A protein has these predicted regions:
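Residues that define the loop-to-transmembrane-helix transition and helix capping
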Residues: 30-31, 92, 118, 180-181, ...
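Hydrophobic/aromatic residues within transmembrane alpha-helices
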Residues: 23, 32, 85, 111-113, ...
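Hydrophobic/small/kink-forming positions within alpha-helical transmembrane segments
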Residues: 14, 18, 45, 72-77, ...
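Alpha-helical transmembrane segments of compact multi-pass small-molecule transporters, enriched
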Residues: 38-43, 97-111, 189-193, 247-261, ...
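Hydrophobic core positions of alpha-helical segments in small-molecule transporters
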Residues: 8, 35-36, 70, 97-100, ...
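Membrane-interface interhelical linkers
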Residues: 1-12, 20-68, 79-89, 137-155, ...
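Juxtamembrane helix-loop boundary signature in multi-pass membrane transporters
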Residues: 1-8, 103-161, 268-289
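Selected transmembrane alpha-helices and immediately adjacent juxtamembrane segments
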Residues: 148-181
């Protein structure tokens, strides 16, 4: 039964970007991020209740709380950049670049956490890095540089950078407390950050203007994230992590498949090879972890 939960985790994670893209055709990406974070926050605290770890709040010291807040701020910045990139660019290019945060995370872990590097890790990094570079064309760079406000590429790269910082800060902050509780606290920080961004940019007036259809898609993207978390947790409870984690990492393929079906986005031959390299590298990294 756990295999179905693992597949469900990958599926729901994969369709999150698709649902979000459908919800930000006219809606400002910052507003959409703030709305969906409300839904994600409910799921994150639901996970805390399910695992019965809410009592650990009283045991969190000042240092741990500080790093959890910093991690939450990095997560918020990553989400804001990610959905802005999705609004401006193609899913089949934004998502693979965002996934390259794995490379940065490992490099930062090596520098700041002094984690070891195995031969398998190096091969995985080379595959993911090479695959990501193959996804970016010269035309993408030229278009991005030609826009005063910045195109999708710069936001996709920033999303990956902030996501990598999230994992490092989160690892430091989550030491000694349950990961589900840590995630819930981080998501709470993200919620405040997202709504502050909405009010600072004066976008709060647009909330009333959101079309019902787009509001539904934005909410569904949050539900998809929550459903993915629940399935992933259940799969890890019943099945081996060595199989569950790689299956979850295949969510990118689900995203790319739906981007072709829903938005008719097509990969170039070079891009397809890039996706293959990223997938192999990611799965290899998950299996050898």
């Amino acid at each position: 039964m756990w295999i179905f939960y693992a597949i469900g985790s990958s599926f729901f994670a994969g369709i999150t970007a698709i649902l979000a893209k459908c919800g930000i055709k006219k809606t400002d990406s910052n507003v959409a991020t703030a709305i969906r974070t409300v839904v994600v926050l409910l799921f994150s605290w639901l996970m805390v209740l399910i695992t019965g770890t809410w009592g650990g709040i009283m045991q969190i010291d000042g240092r741990t709380l500080l790093f959890l807040i910093l991690s939450g701020m990095a997560t918020g910045a990553s989400w804001l950049c990610y959905f802005h990139a999705l609004q401006k660019g193609d899913i089949n290019k934004v998502v693979p670049i965002d996934k390259s945060s794995t490379v940065l995370s490992i490099l930062l872990a090596l520098i700041f956490l002094h984690e070891g590097v195995t031969g398998a890790k190096i091969v995985s990094l080379v595959l993911i890095g090479s695959g990501t570079m193959m996804m970016i064309t010269k035309k993408d760079i030229e278009i991005d540089q030609g826009k005063k406000s910045g195109g999708w590429l710069i936001y996709a790269v920033l999303s990956a950078v902030f996501a990598s910082l999230t994992s490092i800060l989160g690892k430091i902050g989550i030491e000694g407390i349950d990961s589900n509780l840590g995630t819930a606290i981080r998501t709470t920080v993200v919620l405040f950050m997202a709504w502050i961004m909405v009010f600072v940019t004066g976008k709060q007036k647009e909330i009333k203007k959101i079309e019902k259809k787009e509001f539904c898609f934005i909410s569904l993207s949050g539900l998809a994230t929550g459903a993915s978390w629940l399935c992933y947790y259940r799969a890890l409870q019943e099945g081996p992590a060595s199989v569950v984690v790689p299956i979850d990492k295949l969510s990118m393929l689900v995203t790319l498949a739906f981007s072709w079906l829903v938005f008719h986005e097509r990969l170039t031959k070079k891009g397809a090879v890039g996706v293959l390299l990223i997938t192999v590298g990611t799965v290899m990294l998950a299996i050898t972890a």
